[in-house]
């Protein structure tokens, strides 16, 4: 197995520490590894699927993703992955390469928060085209404004822009004009810029995606690249002054 493929999967839900605990669902008949996840403050919800995954059926409880990534970092690129079990329950993952092996203790899946199912999904009035140039600009802009937590989507029904650090008063800010495939004149809506930056970093190899915005305070973005499909929902933050 290629270690980097597994690490890429993990980083798409881990988001540099936004989500640390998750249940991985391995399905041998579909050759698929998937996960549904939620941030600690419940403002980010996501689901992730990787195909061409040749592994046994199992529910794998990962309580401390940071520790798992550190252990995987010890390994060479070509690895063998196996599960240690007690009855039907998976209790550890063993990863080995030509020279060494690591053992990661799994968590009981019952102590990991189960993300809620999305029920009443609002209409998305705005669809923003996400390009590699936008991804690099947003990441650079957020890195320049380290202490700024939010970005705001502003549109007049014709022109749309994302502003990191927006406020009604004069502030340090980064403004990124964007193109849209669907647009309406909605009120300004703001989201967590730190989380969105990590989503973009984890999926920066994607050539195109669409960020959908609802005036009811929800955004959705889906990335499809290589063997990965990832969807993230962000809940709007309190109105920016």
Feature locations, PLM:
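DNA polymerase processivity clamps
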Residues: 1-104, 124-241
């Amino acid at each position: 197995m290629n270690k980097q493929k597994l690490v890429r999967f993990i980083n798409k839900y881990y988001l540099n520490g936004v989500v640390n605990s998750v249940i991985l669902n391995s399905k041998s008949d579909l050759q698929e590894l998937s996960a549904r996840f939620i941030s600690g403050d419940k403002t980010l919800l996501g689901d992730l699927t990787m195909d061409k995954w040749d592994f046994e059926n199992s529910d794998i409880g990962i309580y401390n993703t940071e520790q798992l990534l550190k252990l995987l970092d010890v390994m060479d690129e070509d690895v063998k992955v196996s599960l240690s079990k007690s009855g039907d329950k998976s209790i550890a993952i063993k990863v080995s390469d030509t020279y060494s092996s690591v053992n990661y203790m799994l968590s009981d899946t019952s102590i990991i928060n189960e993300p809620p199912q999305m029920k009443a999904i609002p209409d998305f009035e705005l669809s923003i085209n996400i390009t590699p140039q936008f991804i690099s600009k947003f990441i650079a802009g957020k890195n320049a404004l380290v202490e700024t937590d939010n970005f705001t989507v502003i549109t007049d029904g014709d022109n749309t822009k994302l502003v990191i650090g927006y406020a009604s008063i004069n502030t340090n800010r980064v403004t990124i004009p964007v193109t849209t495939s669907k647009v309406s004149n909605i009120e300004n809506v703001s989201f967590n810029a730190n989380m969105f930056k990590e989503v973009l970093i984890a999926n920066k190899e994607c050539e195109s995606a669409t960020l959908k915005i609802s005036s009811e305070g929800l955004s959705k973005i889906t990335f499809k690249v290589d063997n990965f499909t990832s969807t993230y929902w962000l809940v709007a933050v309190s109105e920016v002054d």
